[in-house]
């Protein structure tokens, strides 16, 4: 099995954590926070633990040392509302496309930009630009052909969601999938509770995800990913029994890399 934690993961975690540390005015506290992050990274098992595990531990450190809880409620409403406002227009664009599935995939991929855990400067203007540019973004033809072949045979799809806003674009993709593959049953999996700006049940309800899929929580608190070993027996069984999994976002993919499922 390939390793799950790389040197690039260390650099990314340190940069995002230092960006948050800049808001700490007490230098002694800031030092303890950064030292705690270094300790978390040092204690990671690169063979079995992916970067979202470190993220989870850093969230606990911030809570215990600084008494801080990340609150992205307003940001979530902003981006969910933005995509919902555009939804009829995007829906029409996908339906009119020469290849509706490809168009829906490209839009859903553009939504992955809305990641406040990785980027320090996420803004609606850049998101709009990305959605306008998606038709020019190439899709791997071999992977796309494989996906279509597997969808033609699949009866069940587990869709692991990532961020707010993006989840509304995921809804459009699922809607497109179900129109093209009417027998496909879709299970949407969201975070157990708020962490960073990841999609939760509240976000799913806000964008009407339940209109196109069965929506469940993953049951894992404070983890920006989907770690099979941390899932409840019932949720894990549903993922293992799905014919196909779509894992949106880096955190979900990192946790599931090499897991043996059809991701």
Give, region by region, the residue ranges found by the protein language model.
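An acidic, phosphate/nucleotide-engaging active-site surface
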Residues: 209-258
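Redox- and metal-dependent alpha/beta enzyme cores, enriched for Fe-S-associated oxidoreductases
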Residues: 169-227
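Internal active-site segments that recognize and position negatively charged phosphoryl groups
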Residues: 146-179
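Gly/Ser/Thr-rich loops at beta-strand to alpha-helix junctions
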Residues: 162-171, 193-195, 250-254
């Amino acid at each position: 099995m390939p390793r799950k934690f790389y040197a690039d993961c260390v650099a990314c975690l340190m940069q995002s954590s230092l960006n948050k540390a800049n808001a700490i005015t007490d230098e002694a506290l800031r030092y303890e926070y950064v030292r705690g992050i270094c300790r978390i990274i040092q204690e990671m098992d690169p063979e079995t633990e992916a970067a979202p595990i470190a993220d989870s531990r850093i969230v606990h450190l911030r809570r215990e040392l600084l008494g801080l809880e990340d609150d992205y409620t307003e940001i979530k409403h902003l981006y969910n509302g933005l995509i919902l406002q555009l939804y009829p227009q995007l829906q029409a664009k996908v339906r009119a496309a020469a290849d509706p599935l490809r168009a829906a995939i490209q839009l859903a991929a553009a939504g992955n930009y809305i990641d406040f855990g990785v980027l320090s400067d996420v803004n609606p203007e850049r998101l709009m630009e990305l959605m306008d540019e998606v038709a020019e973004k190439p899709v791997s033809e071999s992977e796309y052909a494989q996906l279509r072949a597997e969808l033609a045979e699949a009866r069940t799809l587990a869709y692991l969601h990532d961020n707010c806003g993006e989840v509304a674009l995921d809804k459009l993709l699922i809607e497109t999938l179900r129109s093209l593959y009417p027998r496909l049953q879709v299970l949407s999996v969201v975070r157990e509770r708020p962490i960073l700006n990841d999609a939760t049940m509240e976000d799913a309800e806000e964008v009407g995800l339940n209109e196109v899929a069965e929506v469940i929580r993953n049951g894992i608190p404070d983890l920006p990913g989907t770690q099979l070993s941390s899932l409840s027996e019932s949720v894990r069984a549903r993922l293992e029994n799905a014919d196909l999994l779509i894992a949106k976002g880096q955190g979900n993919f990192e946790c599931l890399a090499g897991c043996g499922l059809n991701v």
